[in-house]
Amino acid sequence: MKKLITTSALLILFFNLSVFAASNSSSKTKGWWNVPYPGTFDTSQLVNEQAFIRVKGNKLVDEKGTTFIFRGVNIADPDKLRTENQWSLSLFEELKDWGANVVRLPIHPISWQKNGKEEYFKIIDQAVIWANSLDMYLIIDWHSIGYLPDELFQHPMYDTTKKETFAFWKDVSFRYAGVATIAVYELFNEPTDQGGRAGKANWHDWKTINEQLIDVIYAHDKNVIPLIAGFNWAYDLRPIKQHPVARKGIAYAVHPYPQKAKPKVKSKQNFFDLWESVWGFAAKDYPVIATELGWVSADGLGAHIPVINDGSYGPQIMEFMQERNISWVVWAFDPLWSPTMIKDWNFTPTEQGSFFKKQLQQHK
């Protein structure tokens, strides 16, 4: 009996030591020194082999050299949509049905920070899979507003740092290298010093930081198009006349909302002249993508400067861009983010939504 008790005690002790060792081993496995290197996107999940879109002179072209125009929409930050239970394949199917060939993902620094990159990559992965299945392209936009060199921003949701911005593009370009579905990287949404309230914008510094970002991206992936915005909330490209960003394969972004141009007499020609002088001229030498545009009436939901218009803006801006092969992406396919394209999640079009849906349908 005594021998049996001793044997049992030894067995229990051995079992407990084994459990402790396993637990300790598991704990070690979770240590920072055992975190694996980042992985790349699994392209076996994609069903369509899409053409890479490239820069050729002042045009975007497909692999056959045919001119390609992006025509599409902005959605809200994917994290917002997921929180509202609106992040789904059916959303992308609706965008395709409207006629979009590109979807812009405005990734806010605050949502990136809240989720962490591993969790947010899962969201982007879903967008890539869904867009690819519908033969649509994606623009990834680091959606901050302010002046990055001075790290001063318009709202806490846009707060970031140079280090975080460089790390974001390093990680994104590594993960999605060679994935044709992600065609464009919009390096910084809307640079502005807010009239001195966010530092003092200097084109040399802005040009330099964009060139450095492009170098990081190109070290991982040269098949993507870096997109650079000018000052005044991505409206003013005049500095590139004398000092263009010194990197190949790039395009320029513009957000030509209706109240940005202020002619004394509001004729179509006067608007055209102002647009041409501030940003339209760039299309003679580089691809230009209007990654935000749209309008809302003065009494409409979320009406604010610079997006208020009586509707005359729509036909005029479309004519201007079409004459110059400028790609366009409307803001925003969301019932809350103004100017809105839809009134609700039944996808009922607003005034501008109806207009731009017709424009998209012409190219389906």
PLM features per residue range, with description:
Residues 8-18:
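Bacterial N-terminal signal peptides
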Residues 77-79, 109-113, 146-148, 191, ...:
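Feature marks short, surface-exposed loop/turn motifs that line or immediately flank catalytic pockets
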Residues 64, 68-89, 112-116, 153-157, ...:
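Acidic/histidine-rich helix-loop elements
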